[in-house]
């Protein structure tokens, strides 16, 4: 499941209808008073979260959205019909930013969340409102007010349970293919993943969780280098991070960077982008063990863990051969179960 996770759109609320200049004209009442009605209000623009959507790809082509204008007022004090509101649907997890001010105006995290993004203009007053003791036949009415116009940036933050992070070619796409039905592109060159991919991991008893494959990070990603910078935000809503590292000597690490330095480099990028990401539970997955003899792979893994002073869980796997991958998924499910129990106990203690 590939995602387009950024889009920029323009929204135009409807203008209000104009007020009417009219006079009552009936048989036997040739000089009736003013009876011009008010214009209808313009339609507003809303954005609503829909759990059935998972990408912003539709906004690549449809970028301009206009609500209906209000109808003009009419004689006999008839009000103009209000313009219909326009509702734009986006995936759950979409953040809405006002481009003019760079202000976040909404964060739609639940199905059905709805946000007003452009208010329709009010209808103009008809001349019936301007009658006075000195002006019995006013020829004055007000035009409708213009509707709001905004340029909005939409950013999709994935609502995944687990986020995969690591350098390019660490094997993230291979792992997500191994443990879910997702089929991201896999090849032997960096930056194979150009968009985030989601996969649903099914564990025993029909339970499941969502895992996200984030494009590879490199040194300087938080400052815009490589492809990873724009995707770091997807990690913010995950409950657990799996940090994949290529330990195979045949690969030479990544561009000659040792596994230990790979880990530390990405930790620096997380720190730059959002220090809170380093506070999330993060497990170490040492991948490509199939490219080494078993005892060599185990010794290399233990050395890496020791050099890092790693205290969290760690695993030695071959994502390509699916060796050691499913025990990790079961362990993750058990971890989430404990999280839920702890949250329930905390609520009951209040």
UniProtKB/Swiss-Prot annotation:
Its EC number is 3.6.5.-. GO terms for molecular function: GTP binding; GTPase activity; magnesium ion binding. One of its GO terms (cellular component) is cytoplasm. GO terms for biological process: ribosome biogenesis. GTP binds at residues 166-173, 191-195, 213-216, 287-290, 318-320. Residues 127-147 are annotated as: Disordered. Residues 1-159 form the Obg domain. Its cofactor is Mg(2+). Residues 160-337 form the OBG-type G domain. InterPro entries: G_OBG, GTP-bd, GTP-bd_Obg/CgtA, GTP1-OBG_CS, GTP1_OBG_dom, GTP1_OBG_dom_sf, OBG_GTPase, P-loop_NTPase. It is found in: Cytoplasm. Monomer. Belongs to the TRAFAC class OBG-HflX-like GTPase superfamily. OBG GTPase family. PANTHER family: DEVELOPMENTALLY REGULATED GTP-BINDING PROTEIN-RELATED (PTHR11702), MITOCHONDRIAL RIBOSOME-ASSOCIATED GTPASE 2 (PTHR11702:SF31). An essential GTPase which binds GTP, GDP and possibly (p)ppGpp with moderate affinity, with high nucleotide exchange rates and a fairly low GTP hydrolysis rate. Plays a role in control of the cell cycle, stress response, ribosome biogenesis and in those bacteria that undergo differentiation, in morphogenesis control. This is GTPase Obg. It comes from Stenotrophomonas maltophilia (strain R551-3).
């Amino acid at each position: 499941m590939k995602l387009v996770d950024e889009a920029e759109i323009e929204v135009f609320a409807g203008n209000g209808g104009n007020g009417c200049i009219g006079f009552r004209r009936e048989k036997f009442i040739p000089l009736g008073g003013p009876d011009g009605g008010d214009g209808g209000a313009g339609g507003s623009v809303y954005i609503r979260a829909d759990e059935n959507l998972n990408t912003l790809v539709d906004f690549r082509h449809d970028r301009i959205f206009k609500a209906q204008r209000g109808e003009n007022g009419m004689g006999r004090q008839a009000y103009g019909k209000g313009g219909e509101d326009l509702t734009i649907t986006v995936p759950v997890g979409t953040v809405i930013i006002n481009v003019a001010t760079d202000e976040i105006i909404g964060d739609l995290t639940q199905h059905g969340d709805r946000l007003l993004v452009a208010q329709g203009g009010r209808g103009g007053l008809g001349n019936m409102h301007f009658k006075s003791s000195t002006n019995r036949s006013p020829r004055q009415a007000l035009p409708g007010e213009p509707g709001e116009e905004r340029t909005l940036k939409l950013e999709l933050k994935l609502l995944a349970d687990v986020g995969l992070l690591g350098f390019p070619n660490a094997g993230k796409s291979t792992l997500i293919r191994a443990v879910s039905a997702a089929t991201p592109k896999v090849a032997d060159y960096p930056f194979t993943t150009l968009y985030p991919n989601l996969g649903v991991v099914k564990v025993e008893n029909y339970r499941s969780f969502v895992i996200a494959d984030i494009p590879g990070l490199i040194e300087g990603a938080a400052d815009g280098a490589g492809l990873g910078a724009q995707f770091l935000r997807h990690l913010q809503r995950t409950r657990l991070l799996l940090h994949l590292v290529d330990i195979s000597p045949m690969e030479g690490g990544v561009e000659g960077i040792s596994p230990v330095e790979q880990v530390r480099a990405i930790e620096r990028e997380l720190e730059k982008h959002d220090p809170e990401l380093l506070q999330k539970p993060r497990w170490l997955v040492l991948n490509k063990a199939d490219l080494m003899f078993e005892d060599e792979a185990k010794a290399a893994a233990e050395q890496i863990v020791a050099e890092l002073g790693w205290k969290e869980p760690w695993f030695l796997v071959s994502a390509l051969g699916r060796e050691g991958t499913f025990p990790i998924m079961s362990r993750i499910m058990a971890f989430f179960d404990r999280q839920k129990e702890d949250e329930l106990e905390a609520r009951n203690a209040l």
